[in-house]
Design a protein with these regions (language model features):
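Extended ligand-binding clefts on enzyme/binding-domain cores
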Residues: 276, 281-405
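Conserved, well-structured interaction surfaces
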Residues: 44, 48, 52, 57-58, ...
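Short coil/turn linking the two alpha-helices of tandem helical-hairpin repeats
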Residues: 159-168, 254-260, 453-454
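Flexible, polar/acidic helix-loop-strand segments at domain edges
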Residues: 99-109, 119, 359-437
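Membrane-proximal, proline-rich intrinsically disordered regions
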Residues: 24-78, 548-557
Length: 557
């Protein structure tokens, strides 16, 4: 990767000098000016940074001292660009803004020079570099925290594998250009790193170069045992063994895409490890708020809803502020006219950008007749608590992509709290983002069940999906076809960073079946048009291709 875009490889908080002074440098090999100075790694700060990269822009405030050059801090946010790369350009979301890169996302026209994908790419590599630095200087300080950092490095690499395919690979900080790893080999490395399998992986660009030899104990076995926590409990926000189990289940359900070989049995096995663990579905509503709504509210870390959270990204309007996490998910989808009632401060800073495409609303209204009503009225009309859309004074089908009212609005994420208390800051939400939650395991297990049984769920898979439907106060079904499983994933997980990967796995994004499922503005055409399977992954950023001659660009770019 091109390190010039990643600042603070050794952040100020990460190295404490014996004299009591801090050091901040972009150099990869840090040597004290005074040979007598002893450099002591600040293990807690480095450990925290490995997690914080998924929420914060940099070292200070919402945009302050961003770790990624070239874009403002909020735009480089991990969750913000996960949303853009997974939801924009699918049947789910479209954005009204004209910021460089947004129209390209909307119309599936991204290139190697796409600024936001470049920011996402370097945000992920920043996380990998922090993890590599921790494992270099703090390995052995705390075996459990070391295992967590190994897991986080796997997670960052997973998102790179999914979005960009064959990517640069390194497990250590180095000034030389990284070699390229094949997508299937990266899959195998992540699996081995988590489970402790013995493998040898060679560089894609030079097979004589050994990139990794994994034989150590897997990270999963050394991580914390699964425990459901609230924000009041010590360890809230840390990854436990169920995070590794769910990452493996997520990889296995997509294994045919990533490696060419299906792993349905493994997907079901690891998903059921999560289902049978302590991270249970949250099923208890509070007052006017449903159980499903409470997963995405300002007190989701305190209300009990976090029992479902396997990896919550912590947001706090007072001490942890960022434009690129739940602030973005809420503000970008809200307009002031969406308030449910005068006492509901759902969004303190509406930006009026992202909304839902008409094709997606057919998941809740199959006849294409979603009413022009408020959020609470919409859920009642759909007979499904998950239909959190605002249609009043909106157009059902998007005819004017740059106008926010052309298309229904999404009211899934909120600043308001289920107990009615005020947020810490009137604009900055306290809403945590559940990057991993146990509902995903139910969906993976059901899909694997159907794929193992001729495309129809057995009683086991049907039961998993009906538990989600029961939580949403909608009717149960006798069985589910694969397309119905896909629709159930859409209803449960929309706007949480999954849709492009799901459509790719089912063949409806790019490729031979792309024209079988069209949505408005797919491929840039108002009524939709199919496109090549080369669009199923994004281009490696031009900046990296230009400086690292080890890299080969993805086909079609």
């Amino acid at each position: 990767m091109n390190f010039k875009y990643i600042k603070n490889i050794a952040p100020a908080a990460a190295l404490l000098l014996a004299a009591g002074l801090s050091s901040c440098t972009g150099d990869l090999d840090v040597t004290p000016i005074d040979p007598g100075t002893v450099m002591v790694p600040d293990e807690p700060a480095l450990y925290t940074k490995c997690y914080a990269n998924m929420v914060l822009a940099g070292q200070t405030g919402k945009d302050g001292d961003c770790d990624i050059d070239g874009l403002d801090g909020g735009t480089t946010g991990f969750v913000r660009q996960l949303f853009n790369s997974q939801e924009l350009g699918t049947d789910e979301s479209i954005c009204a803004w004209g910021d460089p890169g947004i129209p390209d996302f909307n119309y599936n026209q991204t290139t190697a020079s796409h600024p936001m994908l470049t920011g996402f790419y370097y945000r992920l590599y920043a996380g990998i570099n922090y993890c590599n630095h921790y494992l270099d200087v703090c390995n052995g300080v705390d075996p459990t925290r070391t295992a967590e950092v190994r897991f986080l490095r796997c997670l960052y690499y997973y998102y790179l594998m999914d979005a960009f395919g064959n990517v640069p690979f390194t497990t250590a900080l180095a000034s030389s250009n990284a070699h390229q790893i094949a997508r299937a080999d990266l899959f195998n490395w992540i699996e081995a790193e988590l489970l402790g399998k013995t493998i040898t992986i060679n560089a894609m660009d030079d097979p004589s170069v050994v990139l990794a030899e994994t034989s150590a104990e897997g990270a999963l076995a050394q991580m914390q045992s699964p425990v459901a926590r609230t924000s009041k409990d010590q360890g809230y926000g840390r990854a436990d063994q169920d995070a590794a189990n769910l990452l493996l289940a997520r990889m296995y359900i997509n294994a045919e895409v990533y490696t060419g070989t299906a792993r349905w049995n493994d997907a079901k096995e690891y998903a059921e490890k999560v289902i049978n663990g302590p991270h249970k579905l949250w099923t208890t509503g509070k007052g006017k708020w449903t159980a499903y709504q409470m997963l995405f509210m300002g007190d989701n870390g305190e209300s009990g809803a976090s029992q479902e959270a396997i990896l919550p990204l912590i947001n706090d309007g007072k001490t942890t502020t960022a434009y690129g996490c739940t602030y973005f998910l809420i503000s970008s989808q809200w307009k002031a006219d969406m308030e449910v009632d005068a006492t509901d401060a759902s969004c303190g800073d509406p930006w009026s950008g992202n909304r839902i495409r008409g094709a997606f609303l057919t998941k809740f209204f199959p006849n294409g007749d979603a009413p022009q009503v408020t959020i609470s009225e919409m859920a009642a009309a759909a007979g499904d608590d998950r239909a959190l859309f605002h249609g009043k004074d909106r157009e059902l089908v998007i005819t004017k992509p740059t106008e926010f009212t052309s298309g229904y609005s999404v009211g899934k994420f909120r600043s308001s709290k289920s107990d009615g208390s005020a947020q810490n800051d009137p604009k900055v939400p306290d809403t945590d983002f559940f990057l991993m939650r146990s509902a995903e395991a139910y969906l993976i297990a059901a899909e694997a069940d159907a794929r193992l049984n001729g495309g129809i769920t057995t009683a086991t898979g049907t039961g998993y999906l009906n538990q989600l439907r029961a939580r949403a106060n909608t009717s149960s079904m006798n069985q589910f076809s694969l397309n119905q499983v896909l629709d159930e994933r859409a209803r449960e997980l929309y706007c949480e960073g999954f849709r492009r990967s799901d459509l790719v796995r089912f063949g409806y994004y790019g490729g031979a079946k792309s024209s079988e499922y069209l949505w408005e503005w797919k491929g840039g055409a108002e009524t939709g048009v199919g496109f090549s399977e080369t669009k199923n992954i994004f281009a490696l950023p031009f900046d990296d291709i230009n400086v690292n001659k080890n890299l080969k660009q993805n086909p079609g770019y």
